[in-house]
């Protein structure tokens, strides 16, 4: 397992070197998020690309058909290399490692803003600005609808959670009630 980990980190580092040399790091980050989204929403692609019953050329054709018109050619070829070397099972780790390395290179970070309803890009930009000042680096937020929130927002950046939602208030109330009941039962 360690060998694979070392290999896919090497793939991510190589992709970073290429994106830096092309002065296109930000575009590659966005393309990586696009790839992650497409594959996440079409899990059958993972089975297809890791299958030994489907030929390499057929896999390459599928990659071309899905991604060629939407992402940088280098990234299309990068996906083909991963498929060719039977490492597609690790596509997510490779792309996430690239994003992490690229963000470090650009002195920025990415996070997720979750709401129970759609919000405007102006509001998202406002949160990005506030968090950038608070964290001391450029913050980019991707929006996600989370129906469990009921109302309010949750922002996750660098493993930190900033939350103000009815869901979190109910969760806190439940914990306090449990604590109160346990204390009352101990008397």
Swiss-Prot record:
Q: What function does this protein fulfil?
A: F(1)F(0) ATP synthase produces ATP from ADP in the presence of a proton or sodium gradient. F-type ATPases consist of two structural domains, F(1) containing the extramembraneous catalytic core and F(0) containing the membrane proton channel, linked together by a central stalk and a peripheral stalk. During catalysis, ATP synthesis in the catalytic domain of F(1) is coupled via a rotary mechanism of the central stalk subunits to proton translocation. This protein is part of the stalk that links CF(0) to CF(1). It either transmits conformational changes from CF(0) to CF(1) or is implicated in proton conduction.
* Pfam families xrefs: OSCP
Compartments, as annotated in UniProt: Cell membrane
> Self-association or partners: how does it assemble?
F-type ATPases have 2 components, F(1) - the catalytic core - and F(0) - the membrane proton channel. F(1) has five subunits: alpha(3), beta(3), gamma(1), delta(1), epsilon(1). F(0) has three main subunits: a(1), b(2) and c(10-14). The alpha and beta chains form an alternating ring which encloses part of the gamma chain. F(1) is attached to F(0) by a central stalk formed by the gamma and epsilon chains, while a peripheral stalk is formed by the delta and b chains.
InterPro entries recorded: ATP_synth_OSCP/delta_N_sf, ATPase_OSCP/dsu
Q: Name one GO cellular component term.
A: proton-transporting ATP synthase complex
Q: What cystine pairs are annotated? A: none
Q: Give UniProt keywords alphabetically.
A: ATP synthesis, Cell membrane, CF(1), Hydrogen ion transport, Ion transport, Membrane, Transport
Primary residence: membrane
What family does the Swiss-Prot or TrEMBL record give for this protein? Belongs to the ATPase delta chain family.
A GO molecular function assigned to this protein is: proton-transporting ATP synthase activity, rotational mechanism
Q: Gene3D superfamilies attached here?
A: N-terminal domain of the delta subunit of the F1F0-ATP synthase (1.10.520.20)
**Which gene is the coding source of this polypeptide chain?**
atpH
Please give, as recorded in its UniProt entry, the membrane topology of this protein: Peripheral membrane protein
Its domain of life reads Bacteria
Cross-referenced SUPFAM superfamilies: N-terminal domain of the delta subunit of the F1F0-ATP synthase
Q: What is this protein called?
A: ATP synthase subunit delta
Organism the protein comes from: Mesomycoplasma hyopneumoniae (strain 232) (Mycoplasma hyopneumoniae)
């Amino acid at each position: 397992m360690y060998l694979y980990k070392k290999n896919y980190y090497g793939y991510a580092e190589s992709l970073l070197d290429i994106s830096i040399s092309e002065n296109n790091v930000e575009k590659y980050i966005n393309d990586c998020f696009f790839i992650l989204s497409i594959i996440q929403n079409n899990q059958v692609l993972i089975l297809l690309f890791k299958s030994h019953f489907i030929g390499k050329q057929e896999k390459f054709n599928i990659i071309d058909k899905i991604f060629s018109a939407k992402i940088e050619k280098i990234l299309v070829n990068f996906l083909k290399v991963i498929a060719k070397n039977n490492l597609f099972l690790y596509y997510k780790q490779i792309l996430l490692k690239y994003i992490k390395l690229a963000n470090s290179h650009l002195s920025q970070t990415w996070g997720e803003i979750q709401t129970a309803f759609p919000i405007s890009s102006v509001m998202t930009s406002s949160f990005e600005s506030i968090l950038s000042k608070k964290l001391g680096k450029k913050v980019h937020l991707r929006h996600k609808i989370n129906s469990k929130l009921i109302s309010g927002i949750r922002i996750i950046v660098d493993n930190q959670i900033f939350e103000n939602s009815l869901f979190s208030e109910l969760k806190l109330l439940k914990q306090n009630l449990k604590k109160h009941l346990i204390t009352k039962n101990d008397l």
